Amino acid sequence: MADPRFFRVAGPFTLAQLAELSGASVAEGCDLGASFVDVAPLEQAGQDNVSFLDNRKYVGAFQASKAGLCVIAPEMADKAPEGMALLLSPDPYRAYARIAQAFYPNPAPEPWVAPTAWVDASAAVGEGCRIEPGAVIGAGARIGARCRIGANVVIGQGVVLGDDCTIGANATVSHALVGSRVNIYPGARIGQDGFGFAMGPQGHLKVPQLGRVLIGNNVEIGANTTIDRGAGPDTVIGDGSMIDNLVQIGHNVQLGRGCVIVAQVGISGSTRMGDFVAAGGQAGITGHLKIGAGAKIAAQAGVMRDIAPGETVGGAPAVPMADWLRQSAILGKMARKKS
């Protein structure tokens, strides 16, 4: 159960309502008028709670659960405890996400501009925005409607935010055009100089970074993540991409739609990713590469070559996943024999 000090629950909802909003089907014999007041994990749920099962590792917890309603895959229905109502979906986690969003909607901010915030006279702030203490909105910046600007945020000169954006405390955004429904978490740094130098024994000469950061709609950027602006071409983050905490994205990088970049990944300059690429935690991707659409990069992989669309790679240097697993098995056998 969510702590009410931090989360405000909506509802209750009937089984019929939850089925409609989740897109799941109701198992036979369930009471469509049954009411539920919250979501909860399998182990903590009670009769008026909704839970879900998406991973077979937790079948035991599912069978022991007291949840009144559970979202599951159809093939798991025969394992349900007696008396539990069921919503059946081929993608239980996604259906549950819709239900959880209904119980915990993201409300519009309470409009307010803190007395200690500073908004330049030439900046434009949309209706219904909340600008918290210490925030700075630079000259010519444009903030869309219903945006939340956290404490001590700095929005630089000329920056554009779309509607319904949230910028977490202490984040900075400069040289950037940001779409709508973008969530930038606390401490993130968007649009600072790319790491560009003409290197030589006589010293390293800084190359002016003259591009921008272009962020699409429905993007999340995690806490303390840094995204450098382009050197001339822009750095681009495609619609619907999800970027975890502590990620470094270099200048001129282009991410397609729906990319998922997990914590501590580093992407060097001018690498291009297609749509729906996934990179596991601490993967390192060198510069000037092409990563095809749908490619998957394992955690801690070191990518030093182009990756074909749909290919899965692992290891350092990264190779096709089957090769990496085979190499790891052979090395393990050799080590055991030697010992």
From Swiss-Prot:
Keywords: Acyltransferase, Lipid A biosynthesis, Lipid biosynthesis, Lipid metabolism, Repeat, Transferase. One of its GO terms (molecular function) is N-acyltransferase activity. One of its GO terms (cellular component) is membrane. It comes from the Bacteria. It is an enzyme of class 2 (transferase). The active site is at H251 (proton acceptor). Gene3D superfamilies: Hexapeptide repeat proteins, MurE/MurF, N-terminal domain. Its EC number is 2.3.1.191. Pathway: Bacterial outer membrane biogenesis; LPS lipid A biosynthesis. GO terms for biological process: lipid A biosynthetic process. It catalyses: a UDP-3-O-[(3R)-3-hydroxyacyl]-alpha-D-glucosamine + a (3R)-hydroxyacyl-[ACP] = a UDP-2-N,3-O-bis[(3R)-3-hydroxyacyl]-alpha-D-glucosamine + holo-[ACP] + H(+). InterPro entries: Hexapep, LpxD, Trimer_LpxA-like_sf, UDP_GlcNAc_AcTrfase_non-rep. Pfam families: Hexapep (PF00132), LpxD (PF04613). SUPFAM superfamilies: Trimeric LpxA-like enzymes. Homotrimer. Catalyzes the N-acylation of UDP-3-O-acylglucosamine using 3-hydroxyacyl-ACP as the acyl donor. Is involved in the biosynthesis of lipid A, a phosphorylated glycolipid that anchors the lipopolysaccharide to the outer membrane of the cell. HAMAP family: LpxD. Belongs to the transferase hexapeptide repeat family. LpxD subfamily. PANTHER family: UDP-3-O-ACYLGLUCOSAMINE N-ACYLTRANSFERASE (PTHR43378), UDP-3-O-ACYLGLUCOSAMINE N-ACYLTRANSFERASE 1, MITOCHONDRIAL-RELATED (PTHR43378:SF2). This is UDP-3-O-acylglucosamine N-acyltransferase. It comes from Paramagnetospirillum magneticum (strain ATCC 700264 / AMB-1) (Magnetospirillum magneticum). The lineage of its organism: Bacteria, Pseudomonadati, Pseudomonadota, Alphaproteobacteria, Rhodospirillales.
